[in-house]
Amino acid sequence: MAELSSDFDLAPYIEHSLLDPAATLEQIDQLCQEADRYHFAAVCLFPWVVRQAREWLNGRSPRLCTVIDFPNGASTAASKVYAAQEAVENGAQELNVVVNLGWLRSDRADLVHQELAEIVEATGVPIKAILEATRLNPSELEQLTDLCLDAGVTMLQTSTGWFGGATPALVQQLRQLTRNRVGIHAAGGIRTWDQAAALVEAGAIRLGTSYGPMILQQRLAASTPAPA
């Protein structure tokens, strides 16, 4: 993608996230209001508040996303499937599922595939597989992307943000590995307009960040002429 112009609208790329386990209902309400005000693509919240967020959003444009087994991905497949089904019943429209890296590194990629495929089949909503890509070697990353595609996921998310952030190089690598068959969701450490723009230029179609309003305000401030 060509370099973004200074007036490019990043809002439709942003998944406005609040994944602090101590966040209050008031903070989550504010997050939903901000997502609606700025016309963000989605909000991403913990499962316990999905039902309330559905009521707050009440048919507004931001999609409602939640995480499954965040941030470790180490629960049993059965518990993940149950959590995914419950989240959808409560109103989640997209699910960000942390994959089980332990199975992958134990030469049981088949179980990683089976788990994701079961979640895809059981829910019927877009599934984004969180790869924790910065922890994988090139061979592991290629194997994981292949099985995610075969399992039917809609998008690949670079990481939880707990083990390094997204980079343009990583986004480009994932695009090459997937041959653009699914979207790339960049997440982790995205705090500035320049960072966000570079990731979109690299090919990301979704940006997971809790700094969405600040990112847009930075660009607005930079483009506002100084008083004479």
Curated annotation (Swiss-Prot):
Its EC number is 4.1.2.4. Keywords: Cytoplasm, Lyase, Schiff base. InterPro entries: Aldolase_TIM, DeoC, DeoC/FbaB/LacD_aldolase, DeoC_typeI. GO terms for cellular component: cytoplasm. It is found in: Cytoplasm. GO terms for molecular function: deoxyribose-phosphate aldolase activity. It catalyses: 2-deoxy-D-ribose 5-phosphate = D-glyceraldehyde 3-phosphate + acetaldehyde. Its main location: cytoplasm. The keyword Lyase applies. It comes from the Bacteria. GO terms for biological process: 2-deoxyribose 1-phosphate catabolic process; carbohydrate catabolic process; deoxyribonucleotide catabolic process. Pathway: Carbohydrate degradation; 2-deoxy-D-ribose 1-phosphate degradation; D-glyceraldehyde 3-phosphate and acetaldehyde from 2-deoxy-alpha-D-ribose 1-phosphate: step 2/2. Disulfide bonds: none annotated. CDD domains: DeoC. It holds the Pfam family DeoC. Belongs to the DeoC/FbaB aldolase family. DeoC type 1 subfamily. Catalyzes a reversible aldol reaction between acetaldehyde and D-glyceraldehyde 3-phosphate to generate 2-deoxy-D-ribose 5-phosphate. This is Deoxyribose-phosphate aldolase. It comes from Synechococcus sp. (strain ATCC 27144 / PCC 6301 / SAUG 1402/1) (Anacystis nidulans). The gene is deoC.
